[in-house]
Amino acid sequence: MTGISLPPELQRVHMVGIGGAGMSGVARILLDRGGLVSGSDAKESRGVVALRARGAEIRIGHDASSLDLLPGGPTAVVTTHAAIPKTNPELVEARKRGIPVILRPVVLAKLMTGYTTLMVTGTHGKTTTTSMLIVALQHSGFDPSFAVGGELGEAGTNAHHGSGTTFVAEADESDGSLLEYTPNVAVVTNIEADHLDFFGSEQAYTAVFDSFVERIAPGGALVVCTDDPGAAALADRTDALGIRVLRYGSTGDNLAGTLLSWEQQGTGAVAHIRLAGEHNPRAVRLSVPGRHMALNALAALLAAREIGAPTDSVLDGLAGFEGVRRRFELVGTAAGARVFDDYAHHPTEVRATLEAARTVVDQNGGRVVVAFQPHLYSRTATFAHEFGAALSVADQVVVLDVYAAREQPMAGVSGATVADHVTAPVTYVPDFSAVAAHVASIARSGDVILTMGAGDVTMLGGEILSELRLKDNRGMPGAGAS
């Protein structure tokens, strides 16, 4: 939207950890709105390369002198909540110089000032639902600004400064930062215990969603999935606040949108829905598999309709939705097996993705093979049993060691902690460099192979394809055979 200038403190910004999914999106919007941006990151990445091409000055590695990448220095330094330690030399130097240090969610909230804002949150499905909503609005004649935690297949980016008056964003609940926002339309996909390392208890985690809903702007609405017990309870509590609630799901009373049925078609699906006030069902065609994707699409439809998007154009937009990077993303095919990559790192996400894979593979008589990398020692310890049960949906399971991210190792917790609870055939492979060859050795033609997790397991897809091609060329058992 033209006519809204950047706040003075955001006109010259240095960003610590600029290559991350959330940070790079904010940087892109700042640049597109005429701001000057510098930054630093621990390593080169696609995000860093893309931002440099748009004019950002970026240094690899962290050093106090990076604050001088912009002539005259920055008006603010932006950082994230947990990934960047307070001892980072650039943050130390900023405080020494008296330069304000601002968290990313605060910056995003400032960038949304003056817009009609639609925000999506929940334990699972945030990125995909946000992306579906963006694509639906674009197809309906809107040009929304947006910031999302993944790369849209259609746009090839995670953020955009649009010409319209609408801003769509993903609201991350993991650190409570969603309380920086005041949405006009809020979508809550589900609520289930997670991020207990930050919140300390399930009750504290759940409470942040109540606080978020209380921040909905006057005249706004909550779109919420009542198939999920946690979200359904939130809807009931929200009724008492006088906020308009649009419920969606497959069962329940007073639903604004009902998922009647869905059926798998190739790697996509067709969902049949009924909207409140309409007698005849409608069909929603999707290129992504799984019942959970049908529910995400229904949420996007209801949210888009709230700001005037025509139903038919929204449905057409959803039919063209190509997915999000690292959400059941096809990496390639070799030796008759298809390799997908997925970000799932919570038991519920793991189960939903594997069940979606099951519907795809059952059409071809193959098997579901998953290489799963647990993410965070605290999450692994808390949900080891649940991870084991979810992974057991697959036919063959390979468990990697834990991706620590920001955490220190925890005694007695490893990938084996998860593998011990898997009832399907399972192998624990702690040596990362050996995983691709092992997966290829057990794969058969017709299989769907998934690399799964929020860490560097995403790097393995290409390696598995290479190993499968070698296996196929050598005529080893299993290659090219069902």
From Swiss-Prot:
Q: Name one Pfam family in it.
A: Mur_ligase_M
Q: Name one GO molecular function term.
A: UDP-N-acetylmuramate-L-alanine ligase activity
Its UniProt entry gives the catalysed reaction(s) as: UDP-N-acetyl-alpha-D-muramate + L-alanine + ATP = UDP-N-acetyl-alpha-D-muramoyl-L-alanine + ADP + phosphate + H(+)
Q: In which pathway does it act?
A: Cell wall biogenesis; peptidoglycan biosynthesis
The residues that the entry says bind ATP are 122-128
Output the InterPro entries linked to this UniProt entry: Mur-like_cat_sf (IPR036565), Mur_ligase_C (IPR004101), Mur_ligase_C_dom_sf (IPR036615), Mur_ligase_cen (IPR013221), Mur_ligase_N (IPR000713), MurCDEF_pg_biosynth (IPR050061), UDP-N-AcMur_Ala_ligase_MurC (IPR005758)
List its EC numbers.
Answer: 6.3.2.8
Keywords associated with the record = ATP-binding, Cell cycle, Cell division, Cell shape, Cell wall biogenesis/degradation, Cytoplasm, Ligase, Nucleotide-binding, Peptidoglycan synthesis
A Gene Ontology biological process noted in the UniProt record is:
regulation of cell shape
Subcellular localization: Cytoplasm
Give GO cellular component annotations, separated by semicolons. Answer: cytoplasm
Q: What class of enzyme is it?
A: ligase
Gene3D superfamilies with a match to the protein in the record: Mur ligase, C-terminal domain (3.90.190.20), Mur-like, catalytic domain (3.40.1190.10), NAD(P)-binding Rossmann-like Domain (3.40.50.720)
The record, for PANTHER family, names: UDP-N-ACETYLMURAMATE--L-ALANINE LIGASE, UDP-N-ACETYLMURAMATE--L-ALANINE LIGASE-RELATED
The similarity comment for this entry is: Belongs to the MurCDEF family.
Q: What does this protein do?
A: Cell wall formation.
The protein's name: UDP-N-acetylmuramate--L-alanine ligase
